[in-house]
């Protein structure tokens, strides 16, 4: 199957980005809406606004791939080696189930594996598990590092076979109803009632995604560093736990008409082809994104280098281990992922995507979700194409060139909640937001956090000078709270080194909206054209 988490892993209820219709994520969602009949047809369960059948998503991805004449899709191989010369990656080796080998030589290689399997093979340094507070600077990180990753899940897709049907599976070995006694409350009609538990992942087509964290089928297994055969054997425990949970749903709860879907996964047990890994290896990149880059966006200039966006809270699944530190995560606004998190610190001609990007363990809880991973992958592919065209290492491709290429694909580089791709000024407002001259206002909001640009609001003089000062330090930060007028904006833009805007006398004393100010900035100062490095510092 094509699609990873969304298809082969069966995680077909997407988390987040409903209000960030960016790039490939939006293209994929448009295909789903056309296939099923609109937005409402996908909003079938309460965990997500976008639910679908894995085989439908797979067909969509194959259709999208077939539209690219230079793209060849090859199935049935797994990564077994990385080709390299010193610190430079030159391609990869793959092996099929019969032992057949395939060598792919490439100018640029991208690791899009779930667990970062190309990292050790390429000699790229990485981290695994929870980071120490002294290492990341995150106040919420534990005092000491450990190698514990989040719980994983083997997803089951159940199908309603109709009244009178009994699709109860054979009682699995080792089944004990007490194992799942806390997954629901039979006396409750609330969130954790039996029906509500199933409605969590209700999909179109009379199906249910079984990916339940509350004493359900999550499991903690130490498999990341195991060789392929040993990892596969160890993951059998996850498959067995899901089968026990399915039997529990059928036998104890009485949902006998719900059986493992016969039209999704061609596996011996009918479960997803691959486990849903929430965390694996995390590369040491040119930069490392931390939770502080989300909670305090403007403390570091990494926001200037955004290449993908997300709006999901920090979500860790660690219920299966009681020996780990308990962390109460703060509410966060939406965020962008910096370009430098995709580029290894030392390895050349190599880009990292998926969950193996250079992020802290804490913020991985937000960057790991399907829409963010898809958009980060789009950025990785864009960076790879530009590096190949330029015949240069990825780290030498200008940040702004990557961002411009993404904007041309209607992809977000800043997580603007209130400016959509069909806005005629979308690209301009994205660019100006990415300079920080006009700052976003973050808002934690339930499970769909926001960052507002407020294009139709005016802006105080002091707020404008604060943003302009970062671009042109010669501009002093003022405390003036009056609304910025066109004449005052023109004067400040000229003082910052821009062209003097031509302002009609009748408009001189009128306050500018943030939209009009952004257009004026782009026309007369063009701050986005000023290069930034991978740390977001102006060159």
Which ranges hold each PLM region?
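Conserved N-terminal/central alpha/beta ligand/cofactor-binding core
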Residues: 2-81, 85-87, 127, 150-156
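Second-shell loop/turn segments in exported
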Residues: 13-18, 45-51, 105, 228-235, ...
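Stable alpha-helical elements in mature extracytoplasmic
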Residues: 24, 28, 57-61, 114-118, ...
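Glycine-rich, acidic and aromatic/proline-enriched surface loops and short helix-turn segments
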Residues: 34, 67, 81, 342-358, ...
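Flavin (FAD/FMN)-binding glycine-rich loop and adjacent Rossmann-like elements that form
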Residues: 76, 95-108, 112-406
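Long, well-structured alpha-helical subdomains associated
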Residues: 396-426
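Extracytoplasmic Gram-positive cell-surface binding/anchoring modules and repeats
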Residues: 415-528, 539
